[in-house]
Amino acid sequence: MYSFMGGGLFCAWVGTILLVVAMATDHWMQYRLSGSFAHQGLWRYCLGNKCYLQTDSIAYWNATRAFMILSALCAISGIIMGIMAFAHQPTFSRISRPFSAGIMFFSSTLFVVLALAIYTGVTVSFLGRRFGDWRFSWSYILGWVAVLMTFFAGIFYMCAYRVHECRRLSTPR
């Protein structure tokens, strides 16, 4: 059980760090505009060496940002539950902490996938046509790696829960 929780906690830390870095950086998309390179993130866009805030209140930007923030909150809550799973205190005895951590990481995964799907759909269908020479960049790729890490954190915590339940049910009363 502890090895599953340790693996889950490792994946959780890495996934959450990648998620926060992806959300905070400005390299989701790179393109060429008027002969110079430009790049953009969720919060800013940069032309040359000068960056500007994204002040447009466009629905897909707001949805992508909201889902990324929800994902980060779920991942942080999952880490807290995952750390609490190592303690054997009788508080919250009706709620399994590894199970709760697993649910939080699956929720985080769902929110990241929704954010990346919205961003991908809009970028390919609208922005891709607007800018001829463009590509997704490293911040966006970190988001997809965070999907894998939070998903595997959820898997590890669900395995830890299953092992714990099997042991609990097999011990005589």
From Swiss-Prot:
Subcellular localization: Membrane
GO terms assigned for molecular function: structural constituent of eye lens
Keyword annotations from UniProtKB, A to Z: Cataract, Disease variant, Disulfide bond, Eye lens protein, Glycoprotein, Membrane, Phosphoprotein, Transmembrane, Transmembrane helix
GO cellular component, one term: plasma membrane
Disease named in the record: Cataract, multiple types 19: An opacification of the crystalline lens of the eye that frequently results in visual impairment or blindness. Opacities vary in morphology, are often confined to a portion of the lens, and may be static or progressive. In general, the more posteriorly located and dense an opacity, the greater the impact on visual function.
Subunit structure: Seems to be associated with itself or another lens membrane component via disulfide bonds.
Function: Present in the thicker 16-17 nm junctions of mammalian lens fiber cells, where it may contribute to cell junctional organization. Acts as a receptor for calmodulin. May play an important role in both lens development and cataractogenesis.
Name of protein: Lens fiber membrane intrinsic protein
Source organism: Homo sapiens
The organism's taxonomic lineage, starting at the top: Eukaryota, Metazoa, Chordata, Craniata, Vertebrata
